[in-house]
């Protein structure tokens, strides 16, 4: 793929995008030779590009994005993040950022911030996972582990969940999670926000159970608090303590070095009462040359 091919790809994708958060170009899956370092998103009225590595084509790519921004006339701002630099700075290249920015998905709004941190507050590749939770949440008690900004929780409440418990050790992201519920007019009386280290808070988690639907969506690595390769099994080993008799589990992992066999083995060895149901498909807008290195959303069920 050359720069002209990339430009044409973006023009084609941009014609079909509306207000919903859309991945226009996904190079991270290595499906496009020479562009593994690049992603481009349309987030409501912002064109947002992330450069994960330094590359000689960077200046030309930013110039092409300026042209796309001007040509299409559908965005209010162009933001480019240099993820490879310390603190992952984002620069406003064109236009003016709205006072409040949102990711819109399946009629729900999530607050996002393009200039405050490495991550904007929303992971678009998890759309099918959120849809699954929304479709299966009716009347259920839901546990959302590593809840981040609580998008799963908002989806669950929108789907009729009886209650949701969100657990994340970062109070700031839980505050954004509260706001995400408020943005959508969702009743937070049904929602708990627990700012705790999950691996040290099992008694609190058990107290609010048992849960009918459990979401496990950890970072692959978080210095000092979680490493999927060694800590994921500590969660699986505890599931029987707070899972309802017919509990559904969405077990997610986005570590390229750990495949589906890793999660299946953890369940087989540590929670044999749960059987594997399926792996949810990933979005077509996130192509990959190796499915085992991409996002893995595995569904397990306790009981019949």
Residue ranges and their predicted role:
Residues 1-44:
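Non-catalytic accessory regions of SAM-dependent methyltransferases
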Residues 33-34, 38-39, 58-123, 131:
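Non-catalytic substrate-recognition/targeting regions of SAM-dependent transferases
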Residues 139-148:
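Conserved class I S-adenosyl-L-methionine
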Residues 149-161:
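Conserved SAM-binding loop of SAM-dependent methyltransferases across substrates and taxa
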Residues 163-168:
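Conserved SAM-binding motif I beta-strand of class I
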Residues 169-215:
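S-adenosyl-L-methionine
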Residues 198-270:
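S-adenosylmethionine
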Residues 263-304:
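Class I S-adenosyl-L-methionine
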